[in-house]
Amino acid sequence: MAETDAAAAQQPPQIQMRVLGQFIRDMSFENVMAQRGASGDVQPDVNVQVNLDAKKRSTDNQYEIAIKLNITSKAKGMDDVLFVFEIDYCGIFHVEGVPNEQLHPFLLIECPRMLFPFLRRIVSDITRDGGYPPLNLDNIDFMALYRSELARQQAAAQAEQKADA
């Protein structure tokens, strides 16, 4: 009996994650080409910028995760903007069993990974409804994005320390 209690105490806690809700916090689709009265077949050159944010909510073990996309589409080879699409898509998650030192990466990697398919569909539908071919976003490597942001923050902190010295 004591052996089973000791074995249970040594096992890491079971990670539990539930999506409690997801929603569009803010969205803007500016159809610049249509406002100018222009039409026709143009090859788009699409630029997608991704930002992530995580906030603890007042309820225990609940977090709000936001994926913020800023998408600009220009006519290929020109500076003419076709459309600008900004969306702030959020999910409310209940997370348990994640050690504190792993919580931040978990929230900014695993939670956005769960939300992304829904966000991709919204982007596709809105661009199609805006009169363009549906924009089917490629998968985002949230782990690489997290590591890149962490490296950028560390480099900025080092540069700040050198400037203060």
From Swiss-Prot:
It comes from Ruegeria pomeroyi (strain ATCC 700808 / DSM 15171 / DSS-3) (Silicibacter pomeroyi). Belongs to the SecB family. Keywords: Chaperone, Cytoplasm, Protein transport, Translocation, Transport. This is Protein-export protein SecB. InterPro entries: SecB, SecB-like_sf. Its main location: cytoplasm. Homotetramer, a dimer of dimers. One homotetramer interacts with 1 SecA dimer. It comes from the Bacteria. GO terms for cellular component: cytoplasm. One of the proteins required for the normal export of preproteins out of the cell cytoplasm. It is a molecular chaperone that binds to a subset of precursor proteins, maintaining them in a translocation-competent state. It also specifically binds to its receptor SecA. One of its GO terms (molecular function) is unfolded protein binding. It is found in: Cytoplasm. One of its GO terms (biological process) is protein folding. NCBIfam families: PRK05751.1-3, secB. Pfam families: SecB.
